Regions:
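C-terminal partner/receptor-binding element of secreted or periplasmic proteins
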Residues: 91-121
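Cleaved targeting-peptide boundary
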Residues: 20-26
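Sec-dependent N-terminal signal peptides
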Residues: 3-13
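A short macromolecule-binding patch
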Residues: 73-84
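Short acidic, Gly/Pro-enriched loop/turn segments at secondary-structure junctions
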Residues: 53-65
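Sec/Tat signal peptide C-region and signal peptidase I cleavage site
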Residues: 15-19
Length: 121
């Protein structure tokens, strides 16, 4: 039931912003402002995660932009996730101990919501 409701919300979101690609969705999310960023300097996989929120037609949408580290320390591969409202809270309380595990536990389960996440399988 939760997935069904999230799918309906996602459809409303996509029709409202008329974004067709993951890059367009990401650019729209970035245009929402600064967001709240959690940086992981010591992690092997996650460089930073930035959370954004937006209200559309009386529904609040929550996004996480995740930067995965690359060989060049100044670069990262960025992906957008549509997450639940509680995701930022649980991620922020767990990322200092292990950002990679916090990502796996709290953000990765939302990988299929937008279809913009990398495939880790």
């Amino acid at each position: 039931m939760k997935l069904f409701i999230l799918t309906i919300i996602l459809l409303a979101f996509c029709s409202t912003i008329k974004a067709q690609t993951c890059d367009e969705i990401m650019e729209h999310v970035k245009s929402l402002g600064d967001g709240t960023t959690y940086t992981s300097c010591d992690g092997d996989v996650i460089s930073k995660v930035t959370f954004y929120g937006e209200m559309i037609n009386c529904y609040e949408y929550h996004f996480a932009l995740v930067c995965f580290k690359q060989e060049n320390p100044y670069d990262c591969s960025e992906y957008v996730y549509l997450v639940e409202s509680s995701t930022e809270t649980v991620y922020s309380t767990n990322y200092i101990a292990n950002a990679g595990q916090a990502f796996l536990d709290f953000i990765k389960p939302h990988s299929n919501n937008l279809g913009c996440a990398p495939n880790f399988d």
